[in-house]
Amino acid sequence: MSVGLPGPHSLPSSEEASNSGNASSMPAVFHPENYSCLQGSATEMLCTEAASPRPSSEDLPLQGSPDSSTSPKQKLSSPEADKGPEEEENKVLARKQKMRTVFSQAQLCALKDRFQKQKYLSLQQMQELSSILNLSYKQVKTWFQNQRMKCKRWQKNQWLKTSNGLIQKGSAPVEYPSIHCSYPQGYLVNASGSLSMWGSQTWTNPTWSSQTWTNPTWNNQTWTNPTWSSQAWTAQSWNGQPWNAAPLHNFGEDFLQPYVQLQQNFSASDLEVNLEATRESHAHFSTPQALELFLNYSVTPPGEI
């Protein structure tokens, strides 16, 4: 089938187009030549569409779709995700609300008594004890386990306390109260108990350095003793004295009676003689040589002179 191309004579002129625009009310009458032109233009359009491919989705202009990087992320809320934390909270509450076994006083006494005798029970023994105390096997088993743990914890704490006490006692410095008390103040005593700095110790005692060897009792002593002055040193008095070896515990009035009788037998002349002898002895003993002789005599026994 051959399609004839329309020639230049078939195109309408501008005047005809204007006339056709003005006469819009009149129906357009197409001639057979015009039909052939329409068919040719339709075939050309089909060919161009087949030659040029359709634009792909990539070539199409993007519409206002939200960017995944800039747009806020939408969290998918599912009923399973919502139930997760609620179920966990319920489990925690169920664990906290677990009822603890409340033992009576009689049950506790029986359990403690049995624990002191035997800390580990067999299956049969636990069943017998649970039946006696109206408890379950699990309750008795749990109580014994907890009691053993408490006992071990208590033993561990006691061991730590005793070990710490021994360490503190071993590290404490040793004190010597007897040494500190026996030595006078001013001496430095080492931990070993020995005196320090013997060479630098000055052996000057203020009490000894300031001591004056003048005793007021000795200076003011009057060597006039009534017993010495009234004593008659005659052989008669010594001969008349009975030399009885009386025990020391009987030293009393019996021993003093002859001495009193001897004083009563003195006469006036004897008294004058004794007074003169006393004055002479006082003058003699007032000298330092006599004082030194008297001191030496008082210190040494009579048999060693």
UniProtKB/Swiss-Prot annotation:
- Mutating Q147R leads to what result? Increases affinity for DNA and protein stability
Q: Where is the composition biased (Polar residues)?
A: 65-77
Task: Indicate the impact reported for K141A.
Answer: Decreased protein stability
A single MF term (Gene Ontology):
DNA-binding transcription factor activity
Region feature Sufficient for strong transactivation activity, mapped onto this chain = 248-305
Q: In which tissues is it expressed?
A: Not expressed in oocytes and spermatogonia (at protein level). Not expressed in many somatic organs, ovary, testis, fibroblast and hematopoietic cell lines.
UniProt xrefs under SUPFAM superfamilies: Homeodomain-like
| A cellular component annotation (GO) from this entry | nucleus
Q: What is its main location?
A: nucleus
Region spans: Disordered: 1-30, 46-95
Positions of region (Sufficient for transactivation activity): 198-247
Query: Annotated DNA-binding ranges?
Result: 96-155
**PROSITE patterns hit by this protein:** HOMEOBOX_1, HOMEOBOX_2
Q: Where is this region: Sufficient for interaction with SALL4?
A: 96-155
Q: Its function? A: Transcription regulator involved in inner cell mass and embryonic stem (ES) cells proliferation and self-renewal. Imposes pluripotency on ES cells and prevents their differentiation towards extraembryonic endoderm and trophectoderm lineages. Blocks bone morphogenetic protein-induced mesoderm differentiation of ES cells by physically interacting with SMAD1 and interfering with the recruitment of coactivators to the active SMAD transcriptional complexes. Acts as a transcriptional activator or repressor.
**Family, per entry:** Belongs to the Nanog homeobox family.
Q: What is this protein called?
A: Homeobox protein NANOG
